[in-house]
A protein has these predicted regions:
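Extracellular carbohydrate-recognition regions
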Residues: 97-133, 276-282, 287-288
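Short carbohydrate-recognition loop motifs
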Residues: 132-165
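Structured interaction patches on ligand/partner-binding surfaces of diverse proteins
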Residues: 66-99
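Bacterial Sec-dependent N-terminal signal peptides
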Residues: 1-9, 287-288
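Extracellular carbohydrate recognition
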Residues: 256-282
Length: 288
């Protein structure tokens, strides 16, 4: 007869000055007992463990890569929550409240770029953009103990599109050998559809590659009302284009593309201002 473990949710604990905000979207628990993986469990979950007595139980956070529910993975930038001598009792439920931490900086975690909009803005409009991005602290901005401002882009109904990109050139891609990985963490609140992608400079020209279509969050009277978080995989493109001079992350409302990013619908509000709020942006990587 098995023992049972119940996990309602995972929490993230991190130092704001080093890692930024502790927002997360951990939807799964990847569970190992005595270093052997027993499964990935969508939270909340109560699951059986065919062990009794004291055992090491490790919980790793799981995400939906690129916001795709079918693309589940554990998050490689976070340490597992370890219970070294957890007492497992047959036909009994033990409830765990795992607290997750990032790996130490320089030891499994590297911050290539971070933007929380609390000071100068590290995003710049491209030449084809019809507007820019501003830091605001209105009612829709992300507010917490350490956060008072968010980035906001507004397009009036008669405007065309915006594109903003990281002002900083990202050059860590040469370190991404083997199974090295890179990810963009992004909090957003929008009433419109937008693309997130990578632009890179190669062979004397700039290429743009959209990666993920981000759909609108909840809205009321045309104003976006709900913040969401997404994890966007950058590493595979950076490794494929390893001979590029540099990369930049970009955000755009221009949904015309030659790439089949998503077969789903494209939404634009009709006769409404289009709002795009961004916050807690992090480009993180771990080389191999």
């Amino acid at each position: 007869m098995p023992a049972y473990i119940h996990i309602e949710a995972l929490s993230l604990d991190c130092d704001y000055s080093d890692y930024g905000a502790n927002t997360h979207n951990f939807i799964d628990a990847w569970v190992a007992v005595d270093e052997q993986t027993i499964g990935c469990f969508e939270l909340p979950s109560t699951f059986p463990v065919l062990k009794k007595g004291k055992h090491k139980v490790s919980i790793r956070p799981g995400i939906a890569v690129n916001g795709i529910g079918a693309a589940r993975s554990y998050y490689p930038f976070c340490k597992p929550a370890d219970y070294l001598n957890l007492e497992l009792v047959e036909d009994s439920i033990i409830t765990l409240n795992p607290v997750i931490n990032y790996f130490p900086i320089g030891a499994g975690f590297n911050m290539a770029w971070k933007e929380d909009f609390e000071s100068a803005i590290g995003l710049s409009p491209t030449f084809e953009s019809d507007t820019s991005i501003m830091r605001v602290n209105d009612a829709q901005a992300w507010h917490s103990e350490n956060s008072f401002y968010s980035g906001r882009i507004v397009l009036p109904p008669d405007s065309l599109d915006f594109t903003v990109a990281t002002s900083e050139e990202l050059t860590f891609h040469t370190e991404l050998t083997g199974d090295g990985s890179a990810m963009l963490e992004m909090d957003y609140n929008t009433n419109d559809t937008m693309f997130v992608g990578l632009m890179y400079y190669k062979n004397y020209k700039t290429e743009k590659l959209p990666l993920v279509k981000v759909l609108p969050t909840d809205k009321e009277h045309g104003i976006p009302q709900k913040w969401k978080k997404i994890y966007i995989n950058l590493g595979h493109i950076m490794k494929e284009e390893n001979d590029a001079s540099y990369f930049k992350v970009y955000f755009t409302s221009d949904l015309t593309t030659d790439y089949d990013v998503d077969a789903g619908y494209v939404y634009h509000p009709v006769n409404e201002q289009r709002y795009y709020y961004l916050d807690n942006l992090k480009v993180i990587y771990r080389p191999r």
